[in-house]
Amino acid sequence: MVMIKSLVFDKDGVLLDLIETWLPVMQGLAEYTLSLVPANAGRAVSRAMLLSSVGINDHTGRVDPNGLFARGSFFEIRAVWQTLLPAGMINLQEDETYRSEVKKIVRELGRGNAVAKGDLLTPLTQLSDAGFKLAVLTNDSEGSARQGLEEVGIAHLFEPIIGADSGHGGKPDPRGLLHCCALHGSAPAETLMI
């Protein structure tokens, strides 16, 4: 019988409350993106359209659990938003000014807003004390993930914390999980993804 040695956690929706933590940030990013659309662009784009395209109902705040907001990366969200913007606008994937401003908005609106999914410190400490190796694998950026986990007081329990920008691809690409296995000295069959 194979024994589990390594526990690799997703962050949003598992450790942190996705909606409480990230909905205000996503609304701010939609507002910023919308502010770049020229008034004479000839194509109507609204905050509700941008948010709806990634699975957020702007009027009710409800989130589609299968939408990009819940399951994707910001790389994927930018790609969808690009299709809604007028032709000739900046490339949301490549424009360094846009990407820099997005990082600033995420830091400002996300700082201090991480909401844990209940008491995490006690059970995670018990798992660590029992000898399990703990890691986080998320489609968020590594820096943002670390910030949120630090805010709720549990970052010190995880090694590594891997984001979509950590060089292993975003989920469901298996490279991040395999990297966790290698660092923990555990085989994939000895690893549980939560």
Annotate the PLM regions.
Residues 2-4, 131, 188-190:
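A general structural motif
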Residues 4-121, 130, 146:
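N-terminal helical cap/lid subdomain that shapes the substrate entry/recognition surface
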Residues 108-116, 135, 140-193:
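Substrate-recognition "cap/lid" segment bordering the active-site pocket of phosphatases
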